[in-house]
């Protein structure tokens, strides 16, 4: 990290956030949400850290195309969260009408087949967010 000038570190594993404080960079820490996940607000309170919540499934840590139960967002500081997991043009307004995340992350929700982004789906997704 001393050789590149990064603004943000995005962590996807089981690493401890505090181990990365020495780099003095903002952090986005991915948390994988399962049907049994519970988040306590104090667990999401780290200086210069945002959290990306993504759906965990039996076989995948993200990329499943499935939404997690957004009700878990009711008791956490959503404005610090990046929301991922099953987002697509058909449900993005439903999310935004209930919660105000810092950012949304879309991947498979704008694909017409696995690994192939669809320009029309991408435009539809972005247009809906902008219009909202």
Model-identified regions with their sequence ranges:
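Active-site beta->alpha loop and helix N-cap motifs at the rims of alpha/beta catalytic domains
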Residues: 1-8
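Short loop-to-alpha-helix "cap/lid" segments that border enzyme active sites
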Residues: 3, 14-108, 112-132
């Amino acid at each position: 990290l001393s050789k590149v000038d990064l603004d943000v570190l995005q962590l996807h594993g089981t690493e401890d956030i505090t181990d990365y404080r020495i780099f003095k960079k903002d952090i986005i820490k991915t948390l994988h949400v399962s049907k049994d996940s519970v988040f306590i607000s104090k667990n999401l309170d780290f200086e210069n850290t945002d959290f990306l919540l993504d759906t965990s499934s039996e076989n995948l840590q993200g990329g499943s195309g499935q939404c997690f139960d957004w009700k878990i967002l009711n008791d956490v500081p959503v404005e610090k969260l990046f929301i991922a997991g099953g987002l697509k043009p058909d449900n993005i307004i439903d999310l935004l009408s209930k919660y105000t995340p810092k950012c949304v992350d879309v991947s498979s929700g704008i694909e017409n087949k696995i690994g192939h982004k669809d320009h029309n789906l991408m435009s539809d997704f972005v247009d809906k967010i902008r219009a909202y």
